[in-house]
């Protein structure tokens, strides 16, 4: 049976959630798998996550640049994110996804990842110091309750990075 709450408690909770949403302080992040690493992306920085469409290879590019893909009439540069990070590239499969960078960055870029892991809220996780000197686009690093390390991506810094 559903738990009963008073109208006053319901209204107070609803008002708090609306206030948090209006102020942009919602903490849910999109979680993706990139190789062996878990990455978090702010929802305001992610355009959308889609199954991998056909990718047309481009010659004479870096190994992590997979090519270009047409998504609803828009061309996106497809970057194999785990390979960009220095690891093995994505083995394309049913779980593979393209994370489209938000339109406001005008980057026309999509990150190829091993899979989407849904939404996560890192508010209760322990912040940690990165094991090595972080890139400018590594916003933060966390450890969750299970001991898994999560890295938060700063998309604005990533698209400004000269290596990207």
Where are the language model's segments positioned?
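An acidic, low-aromatic, low-complexity terminal/linker signal
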Residues: 1-164
């Amino acid at each position: 049976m559903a738990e009963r709450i008073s109208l006053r408690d319901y209204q107070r909770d609803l008002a708090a959630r609306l206030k948090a949403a209006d102020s942009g302080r919602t903490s849910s992040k999109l979680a993706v798998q990139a190789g062996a690493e878990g990455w978090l992306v702010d929802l305001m920085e992610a355009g959308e996550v889609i199954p991998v469409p056909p990718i047309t290879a481009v010659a004479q590019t870096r190994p992590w640049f997979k090519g270009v893909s047409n998504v609803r009439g828009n061309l996106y540069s497809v970057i194999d994110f785990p390979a960009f990070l220095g690891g093995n590239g994505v083995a394309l499969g049913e779980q593979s996804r393209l994370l489209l960078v938000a339109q406001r960055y005008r980057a026309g870029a999509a990150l190829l990842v091993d899979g989407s892991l849904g939404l996560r809220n890192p508010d209760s996780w322990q912040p940690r110091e990165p094991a090595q000197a972080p890139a400018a686009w590594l916003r933060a690093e966390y450890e969750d309750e299970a001991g898994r390390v999560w890295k938060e991506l700063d998309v604005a810094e990533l698209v400004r990075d000269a290596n990207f």
